[in-house]
Amino acid sequence: IKILLNMFVYILSYALLADAPKFDYGLSAYKKGNCMGCHKWHGDGGPGYGGAALSLRETGLDREQLITIVECGRPGTNMPFFDKKAYKDDRCFGMKFSDFEGDDKNRPLNAKSYLNKRQINAVVDFIVNDLQGKKVSKEYCIKFFGKPTRSCDGL
């Protein structure tokens, strides 16, 4: 039984460590895109630059919907698009930039830093696997900041 228990612990540890690079790359893409500028480090959103951002922890959007939102943003809101090819053809909601001529209020906003396909998938996987439906934890806080900080106190 001791051997089986040790094997179980080893397999579980390996599985947890295998997810660490995915978490790190997804978090890196989240930071590169400056998602925390609106959605905050914790992913709960709230007031920020340009208004209140959606809580990524409480969103009901599925993976494909999240990919579309990250790639294309949300016209008429402060959610920018992160795919540098967005709105150059009709891949985003069947619309092109020309559809917004004379309508600057609803024109999609460019991200300050574009993400490539791999980064977009990584940030969406990070949202789905590490934020969506989960509470903010001290462990997550320490992973986000790379060390314990005052933000982690009280979690």
Regions found by a protein language model. Give the residues of each.
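Flexible coil segments in periplasmic/lumen-exposed cytochrome c-class electron-transfer proteins
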Residues: 19-22, 32-33, 41, 77-155
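Bacterial N-terminal signal peptides
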Residues: 2, 6-14
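Electrostatic cytochrome c docking/interface patches
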Residues: 15-31, 46-50, 65, 112
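Non-transmembrane alpha-helical segments in soluble domains
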Residues: 27, 67, 71, 121-128
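Short microdomains enriched in Cys/His and/or Lys/Arg
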Residues: 57-71
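Conserved beta-strand positions that form and line the central face of beta-propeller blades
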Residues: 54-56, 78
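Short, cysteine/histidine-rich loop/knuckle motifs that typically chelate Zn2+
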Residues: 37
